[in-house]
Amino acid sequence: MQVKRTTVEKIRIEDINETHRLDPVEVIIENYGEGAGKIIITCWGESWTGFWGSMGGTIEEFFQRVSNDYLINKMADYRESEPDTDGDSDFLRSEIIRQRKDGRLDRSEAAAAWRYVDDFSPDRNSLYYGKTPDELAVLEGMDEPWYFPWPNKPNHKYQYLSRILDVVREVIKPDEQRSV
């Protein structure tokens, strides 16, 4: 049997509501040895965990070198943006106008497509997984609607975790890297 002992550091960050609009954040850091360790971050009942087996330093040093995007991808399944399905009908209308101006649609095709969008308010999922209605099939690219630049909106969970990581990064910064 092999027994290894490590030191665990727990940090509680309070009074950050004014500067970062966050509730208290707790951070638990465990460095297993050179280049291996884990971190657990909790805030308002949610927690995020990351483990790295070969990061070339301590967790504290590693956090200074990597981006929030990398950390969020490793610690949570959040994307920077998410589909804005509320804007799908407006997007289709703008696409009808654009293709009409470009001469790809004649007046009657554009009018029929516009009426269809007004009457049925189709969303991207119904067009991805269903049969494309004849009124919208005249739009160039509608045979493969997943390639359209559908509208997205910022993912609030991603932004929230990014703000937390900014605070954690500043607090766990090694002493020689801290700003005075």
PLM regions: where:
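An exposed acidic His-Trp-rich patch
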Residues: F62-Y116
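Aromatic- and glycine-enriched beta-alpha-beta binding-site module
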Residues: Y32-D77
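Residues in flexible loops and secondary-structure boundaries
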Residues: T19-R21, T49, R79, P83
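A eukaryote-biased signal for long
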Residues: D102-V180
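Short N-terminal edge-element motif at the start of the domain
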Residues: M1-E46
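Hydrophobic, Leu/Ile/Phe/Ala-enriched alpha-helical segments that form helix-helix packing faces
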Residues: M1-Q2, D15, F63, M75, ...
